Amino acid sequence: MKKRALISVFDKDGVLELAKFLRDRDVEIISSGGTYKYLKENNIEVKEISEITDFPEMLDGRVKTLHPLVHAGILAIRDNKEHMKTLEKREINTIDYVVVNLYPFFEKVRENLSFEEKVEFIDIGGPTMLRAAAKNFKDVVVLSDKKDYEKVMNEIKENNCVSFKLRKTLAGKVFNLMSAYDAAISNFLLEGEEEYPEYLSVSYKKIQDLRYGENPHQGAAYYSSTEFDGAMNSFEILNGKALSYNNIKDLDIAWKVACEFEETACCALKHNTPCGVAVGENSKEVYLKAYDADPVSIFGGIVAINRKIDKATAEEMVKIFLEVVAAPDFDEDALEVLRTKKNLRVIKCKNTPQAKNYMVTVDGGILVQGEDNKLANEYKVVTKKEPTEMELRDMIFGMKVVKYVKSNAIVVVKDGVATGIGGGQVNRIWATKEALERGKGGAVLASDAFFPFRDCVDEAAKNGIKAIIQPGGSIRDEESVEACNEHGISMVFTGVRHFKH
């Protein structure tokens, strides 16, 4: 029985080689629209789909392959006598290969196009053929990914057929693709309508397999959103090895912290926790301030600066071991200096962080929440003493940092530098003591949540703290305010909590 292949692709890379390979094996090629013209122009013997259906393309190409003569040829089960009798009666030929890739909705939805223009890139005929062929994979070889063309050709060369195992894998890839494609369309159409829809569909594409996860015994891979360009799916590696699982997680937080600030800012980070954060006039100044805040923890850490890095900054950075240095750009002479460290990963971050929903898996489900991107409802002074202008700036600085520290979290600040960071403690007084121990000489203290008792204020007073900022909201707020008044400390309530679990 003569075999037939239906080829209809938007991305034509590799399709000529595949079509020629099939024609050399006497497989009849059927095609439509632009693919038909492309194959014909390249001297591939091909039939237009309208020759099979006796029905022309219509509605500006919206209807080309949606026809029973096409889909019956794909869906007929070859060892089902009734199916084959029906095909014979209707003079329908079987289709044994379906080679289809889709309109580039993933790419177009991210471009600056009108709603109507984006809708036109929603493919209908392609998914319908792919799903039909994938359902009948026992009898039909379905190719939705150009990377699989060679695998299929190799099996045919070696065995004169495509194995059941590969057919099944290719069918699975179709439904995997369709799941992501439909999710992207769904999210596009529901954007701004339902923040938390009944069914959660997300669309991510694998960028790379990672050597391992958090630890060597854990497998891992990195997936990129198909729906928007965030900071972590658009960076460029300018030096060093590929990023690890831990590198990517750490870089994400370090870059977010640095981008919290309009002024030049640096975040040094280790194990997903900031260890030094500073703002200032230039990249060298903020790097040195962040380094001085904790010269021990920064070793082997990640550094992100929200401005172009110059040679003077790079010369300071290469004095110690760093895993990653990230910035929006680098001077050429700065890159030359950084590249003297062969294993130092130098990352150009092209985009600022996007405020999208945050997801975390639990056993049997996913929790979804909005990003913590609201700093305060107000800055309400609740004590007799008011903070100075500089203290208020440091308070706001502290709140921008503390929301990235695991709760319970305290940050001590002086002159635009996080001099002490205490986090991940199961009670607030321990976090306070940790931050104060590291941040001796700090003037301002920021807390991610309210003080349940006055003990944190008393501890802060012992260590010279002059101003405190916190959300407020405890039934014992008055005790903390009274303690501040006793010690001559100003206190500001924001009304916004920043737990990080």
Curated annotation (Swiss-Prot):
Catalytic activity: (6R)-10-formyltetrahydrofolate + 5-amino-1-(5-phospho-beta-D-ribosyl)imidazole-4-carboxamide = 5-formamido-1-(5-phospho-D-ribosyl)imidazole-4-carboxamide + (6S)-5,6,7,8-tetrahydrofolate; IMP + H2O = 5-formamido-1-(5-phospho-D-ribosyl)imidazole-4-carboxamide
SUPFAM superfamilies attached to this UniProt entry: Cytidine deaminase-like (SSF53927), Methylglyoxal synthase-like (SSF52335)
This protein's GO CC annotations: cytosol
Annotated keywords: Hydrolase, Multifunctional enzyme, Purine biosynthesis, Transferase
Coiled coil: none
One matching Pfam family: MGS
Domain MGS-like: 1-144
The UniProt record lists the keyword Hydrolase: yes
Stored InterPro entries: AICAR_Tfase_dup_dom_sf, Cytidine_deaminase-like, MGS-like_dom, MGS-like_dom_sf, PurH-like
Full protein name: Bifunctional purine biosynthesis protein PurH
Source species of the chain: Clostridium perfringens (strain SM101 / Type A)
